[in-house]
Structure formats: structure tokens, C-alpha cells
């Protein structure tokens, strides 16, 4: 469900959680145990950050999908666009949709160390409307 709708319908204060996914998949079991302990607080939604330059992008997808399926959290995936191609962003949005993730927080993001970004050719990353349009059947 669209988080904006949830907030509007709620009409009172609520909790939300932002998770930074562990880089090491060996730490995921402890991470999910922590999420399980937080579940009784009934957050209105959870968000999962997204590493720039590929550092935790796939982890975000897996973790946000698991939180939605296992704990029935309404989830929002962060999407950092700096350094990503239009094709990659489109594919990532589709993968989120395929995993039932209806909410995305699209951010420019910080330039990863060692990368030089030409903002004139990267202008599309600042306005994702036309990129995400094909995947907008969900609330992305």
C-alpha cells in the first residue's frame, strides 16, 4: 500500500523504522532477529537504505522483500541513483515491483569515492519520473 495513504488514513502519531542493511550476509540472521523483536511495536512502515556504487544495493532488495514477506511490514526501499545507468534503475524498480515492494524513496545520493560524475549527462537521475513511468503500475 502507498505509504502516503497509510499516513493520511492513520491520522495520529506512528512509528516507522529505517534500517541500514548489513553488508555481510552472515549478519543477516541477527538483523532479522532484531526486526522480529521490533515487530510488536507495529511500525506504520519501514525503510531500508541503499548503498551507493553497489555497496549494498542487492542487499536492500533482498532485505526489504524479506521484511515485507516475513513480518508483513509495509516497506520502502531507498534508491540511490548516482552512478547508475537508466537501464539499471529501470531494472531495479521492476525487481522491487516483482517482489511486492510498492514504495521507493529515490535519492541522488553521494558520489562514491573515486568516481567522477558528469552531472550534465546524469541529469536524468535527478528526475526519475520518466524512468519509473513503465513500472508505475505499483505505487513506485
Predicted regions and their residues:
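Single conserved hydrophobic/aromatic residue that forms the stacking wall/gate
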Residues: 129-140
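Hydrophobic faces of well-ordered beta-strands that scaffold small-molecule active sites
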Residues: 15-17, 46-48, 75-79, 104-106
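Glycine-rich, positively charged N-terminal anion/phosphate-binding segment
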Residues: 1-5, 28-36, 53-73
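Metabolite-binding pocket within alpha/beta catalytic cores that recognizes anionic/polar moieties
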Residues: 57-95, 102
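Glycine-rich, proline-tolerant flexible connector loops at the mouths of alpha/beta enzymes
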Residues: 22, 44-61, 111-122
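N-terminal amphipathic alpha-helix/helix-capping segment at the start of soluble metabolic enzymes
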Residues: 1-17
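Flexible, glycine-rich active-site loops centered on histidine and acidic residues
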Residues: 85-128
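Active-site mouth loops of central-metabolism enzymes
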Residues: 17-30, 76-87
